[in-house]
Amino acid sequence: MNDSPAARWTALILIALMMFFGYMFVDVMSPLQALIEQQRGWSPDVFGTYASAEYILNVCGFLILAGIILDKMGVRFTGILSASMMFIGASIKYIGITDWFQTTAFCEWLGTWWVSMPGSAKMAALGFMIFGCGCEMAGTTVSKAIAKWFKGKEMAMAMGVEMAIARVGVFCVFSISPILASKLGGVQGPVGFCTVLLLIGLINFLVFSVMDKKFDGQLVEAGVKSEEP
């Protein structure tokens, strides 16, 4: 199946767009720091703690665990898991910054401990931490998927294209996020928009998984490899 340029580049675009949406979500609140501080009462220290939450578990060894999962379970399982974690984490973060959540008893309870960190920030940090685990796992998975689909083909070029598409997400969100916040009247609009994009990214990877399953079937028939889980 990867002998077809259309098939392998379609596969690349599907997974690259997932990473594009992921990188958009990473920085969606970066240009909105002043707004979130104004609307939710976060201090610069609170914003810094929230932003660092993305990397906490990865620094503590989660990336190594992600590599083990990828080796044991394969590209499809790990990719769907990572895309799901990104979407779930993003949804939790979105809930944490909504106007509705600020009025809940749970948010009030979150504010009763570590009082310098508002309940909304704790909820957003939890979601961002889960998202970060999924995003870094996805990056490793995408690299392995490209190596598989472009073996003996334009592998280096494909990796460069994927990284370029993903990084454009950062440029886009720094431009789009303030506009959405202005149009929608708050920080939750841009975050909600990027959360929906992550759902589309998950769907993209599900489509890729169907293609990858078919590709594996062809490799098994050709005796090149045993079937991947």
Sequence positions of predicted segments:
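Glycine-rich segments within core transmembrane alpha-helices of 12-TM secondary carriers
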Residues: 156-181
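C-terminal ends and interior cores of transmembrane alpha-helices
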Residues: 84-117
